[in-house]
Amino acid sequence: METDSIDSVIDDDEIHQKHQFSSTKSQGGATVVISPATSVYELLECPVCTNSMYPPIHQCHNGHTLCSTCKSRVHNRCPTCRQELGDIRCLALEKVAESLELPCKYYNLGCLGIFPYYSKLKHESQCNFRPYSCPYAGSECAAVGDITFLVAHLRDDHKVDMHTGCTFNHRYVKSNPREVENATWMLTVFQCFGQYFCLHFEAFQLGMAPVYMAFLRFMGDEDDARNYTYSLEVGGSGRKQTWEGTPRSVRDSHRKVRDSHDGLIIQRNMALFFSGGDKKELKLRVTGRIWKEQQNPDSGVCITSMCSS
């Protein structure tokens, strides 16, 4: 893979361009405005990628700094003054960073947390307010956003089928089931209980044997996904195979869910048996249902809620 080369000298005015934002933190009933757009914060911003810098922070002989990732991109030349960078660490700036507390970068999406500088990255990688990645598995889609955006994106850009209701009944047909390559066959989105769920069905190699797998993902966080249960069933010729479990959150990648085998897995010989006929064509009908587990606030007993459709 080729690395980007940065040949132009960056103006000081561009380096120190302010990125104004603020957050609030409650202390003893009073609201404190946190405004990290200070000179110290700006010093910790890499002039090349504009991200916050973390150790090792590099500097040239004239004191211009940049992050370790961008150091390799500029071919050991300072992007500000063009002097050779060498291997000089800016230890003073690294030490100053230890004393800072900054808002989460998802403050504008609702996160009001304030974090020590060196803990901020870890929080942001797990922040409940961070955008969701596109759950479509047929391509490496880079789209991110909230659930409303992703539902529209799946419908309009990926042409995914949309259904309302908590039951599903789908038929999957393949003309030559003996030729199975890793491929996503279908993704369907269901809306029920005011939430969205993605039903995946695909074929892939499990060891030396081809298998078919169906599983459900919840379009939301894991804590909310635990409120729901789903069942899947496939059958034919007087036999059936069932699965019941909790949908995984779309925070877990499609590959992670698939590789954990957390769903209905159908071996090829069983899939052909369910298909009937001369076993030269795959004809699988997968049915299922989603329901919600709610706890009665008075008795503490879990109540199963089924939707009307």
From Swiss-Prot:
Q: Which Pfam families match?
A: Sina_RING, Sina_TRAF, Sina_ZnF
Quote the SUPFAM superfamilies the UniProt record gives.
RING/U-box, TRAF domain-like
Cite the record's tissue specificity text: Expressed at low level in the vascular tissue of mature roots. Expressed in lateral roots and in elongation zone of the main root upon stimulation by auxin. Colocalizes with NAC021/NAC022.
Which family, according to UniProt? Belongs to the SINA (Seven in absentia) family.
Q: What is its EC number?
A: 2.3.2.27
Say yes or no: keyword Signal present: no
What GO terms are given for molecular function? transferase activity; zinc ion binding
- What is this enzyme's catalytic activity, as reactions? S-ubiquitinyl-[E2 ubiquitin-conjugating enzyme]-L-cysteine + [acceptor protein]-L-lysine = [E2 ubiquitin-conjugating enzyme]-L-cysteine + N(6)-ubiquitinyl-[acceptor protein]-L-lysine
Alphabetically list the UniProt keywords. Answer: Cytoplasm, Metal-binding, Nucleus, Transferase, Ubl conjugation pathway, Zinc, Zinc-finger
Function recorded in the entry: E3 ubiquitin-protein ligase that mediates ubiquitination and subsequent proteasomal degradation of target proteins. E3 ubiquitin ligases accept ubiquitin from an E2 ubiquitin-conjugating enzyme in the form of a thioester and then directly transfers the ubiquitin to targeted substrates. Mediates the ubiquitination and proteasomal-dependent degradation of NAC021/NAC022, a transcription activator that functions downstream of the auxin signals, thereby acting as a down-regulator of auxin signals. Involved in the formation of lateral roots.
UniProt pathway: Protein modification; protein ubiquitination
Q: What is the official name of this protein in its record? A: E3 ubiquitin-protein ligase SINAT5
* Species of origin: Arabidopsis thaliana (Mouse-ear cress)
Please report what switches on or represses expression of this protein.
By auxin. Induced by salt stress.
Subcellular locations according to the entry: Nucleus; Cytoplasm
Q: What is known of its domains?
A: The RING-type zinc finger domain is essential for ubiquitin ligase activity.
Summarize subunit and interaction data from the UniProt record for this chain.
Answer: Homodimer; homodimerization is essential for its function. Interacts with UBC28 and NAC021/NAC022. Interacts with SINAT6. Interacts with ATG6 and TRAF1A. Interacts with WAV3. Interacts with FREE1.
InterPro entries the record matches: 7-in-absentia-prot_TRAF-dom (IPR018121), E3_ubiquitin-ligase_SINA (IPR052088), Sina-like_RING (IPR049548), TRAF-like (IPR008974), Znf_RING (IPR001841), Znf_RING/FYVE/PHD (IPR013083), Znf_SIAH (IPR013010)
